[in-house]
Design a protein with these regions (language model features):
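Alpha-helical membrane insertion/targeting regions
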Residues: 1-177
Length: 177
């Protein structure tokens, strides 16, 4: 098996499986050491999966049109960039940005699972998709995952802002001299 394929599989499997636990509040709160150690491994795995996916898209003669090639280059690059920005954020101790960028990177990495679901639904409802429909379904899957991730990110950040506003209103105002 070619090295990029091996790297893609060995990176994607732990990234997709172990990555889910990184978002579980109980693991982060009760096992912060595990979260940090697993996070370091998963950054490497995610980058390996993303970069090898980009390499295969660029250099392997895959059955794809320019549309799917564009989707793969766009979302693969976005995954690598999201993971890199998540790493930079945590190194700066910006936990909120770290969480948001890693969630985006993870959502893109989970695209294959959503692609299987959207493809299966299409087959069950309509029939086997043609090449163009198949490629649009693949792109739609990455978009679906990112929309869900953005909804979660914004929902959590808006809850935090509401709590800050309530806390600010509850504090007695001090005179400034």
């Amino acid at each position: 098996m070619p090295l990029p394929v091996v790297l893609h599989i060995l990176g994607a499997l732990p990234f997709c499986i172990l990555g889910a636990f990184q978002f579980a509040p109980g693991f982060r709160r009760h096992r912060p050491g595990w979260h940090r150690l697993a996070g370091r491994l998963l950054v490497l795995c995610g980058l390996a999966a993303g970069l090898s996916g980009l390499w295969m898209t660029q250099f392997y003669p895959l059955l794809q049109t320019g549309l799917l090639y564009s989707f793969r280059m766009l979302f693969g690059s976005a995954m690598v960039l999201s993971i890199a920005l998540g790493l930079v954020a945590i190194l700066r101790r910006d936990i909120a940005r770290h969480r948001a960028w890693m969630m985006r990177g993870y959502a893109i990495g989970q695209g294959a699972g959503t692609q299987a679901l959207t493809g299966l639904l299409w087959v069950l409802i309509f029939s086997t998709p043609n090449q163009q429909t198949h490629e649009w379904l693949m792109g739609a899957s990455w978009v679906i995952n990112l929309v869900v991730a953005e909804w979660i990110i914004r929902r959590k950040s808006s809850k935090g802002r509401k709590m800050q506003k309530r806390a600010h209103k509850a504090r007695p105002q001090q005179a400034i001299y």
